[in-house]
């Protein structure tokens, strides 16, 4: 598995409230964590960096290799982090702080993931993009209820309101899933600063180009910025290389 991580402030924001990193546990299992923070002042930066760093610090202590162990760990650790961020958010300096989180553990050819908020995890297989997560957002609830279309959701005035985040008062309910990555498959883990700017078809086209994984990642960021870069842009690309690739 090859991994590329990149983050960019974009064209319109004065600071970067996204944070991304990867960590290996004692058995060499990699956990990629992406968070998109929210909250005034520097609260969003702190919420995202703290969530990624806290989860990573706990992950490196583990020696899990079984998917069931990792699944339970993700659920419990994200619950604990929600409480920690909520408690910090009660102080005046950090009022309203919160963050999305995508946490993806790579076990041989499988990816097991946890999802909170409106960042996304997608799979590109045989030239097709499949969204593995469902946005925890007001507009997605309206789409699922049949009240608005996906096209209307893209320009809806309340499209930035999310229905679950790390730092909320009530316990979070992370969506958990597992996916086998076949040779040649890509995972695309990203903040909404990417998917609000470029289409899934454009993601597929860029991934099909004959350049390095880091260059593909940078091409996506450059295109999102070319379109206006209205938000911070953060991407993790995971490539299960074909067996014939050295």
UniProtKB/Swiss-Prot annotation:
Family matches, as SMART domains: PP2C_SIG, PP2Cc
Domain of life of the organism encoding this protein: Bacteria
Keyword Cell membrane found: no
Transmembrane segments: none
Magnesium among keywords: yes
Required co-factors: Mg(2+); Mn(2+)
Cofactor binding, note field: Binds 2 magnesium or manganese ions per subunit.
Binding site for Mn(2+) 2: 36, 192, 231
Protein known as: Putative protein phosphatase 2C-type
Annotated InterPro entries: PP2C (IPR015655), PPM-type-like_dom_sf (IPR036457), PPM-type_phosphatase-like_dom (IPR001932)
Molecular function as annotated in GO: metal ion binding; protein serine/threonine phosphatase activity
Gene3D superfamilies for this protein: PPM-type phosphatase domain
Catalytic activity entry: O-phospho-L-seryl-[protein] + H2O = L-seryl-[protein] + phosphate; O-phospho-L-threonyl-[protein] + H2O = L-threonyl-[protein] + phosphate
Record-linked NCBIfam families: Stp1_PP2C_phos (NF033484)
Endpoints of the signal sequence: none
Enzyme Commission number(s): 3.1.3.16
Key words, A-Z: Hydrolase, Magnesium, Manganese, Metal-binding, Protein phosphatase
Chain sites annotated for binding Mn(2+) 1: 36-37
Annotated PPM-type phosphatase domain residues: 2-240
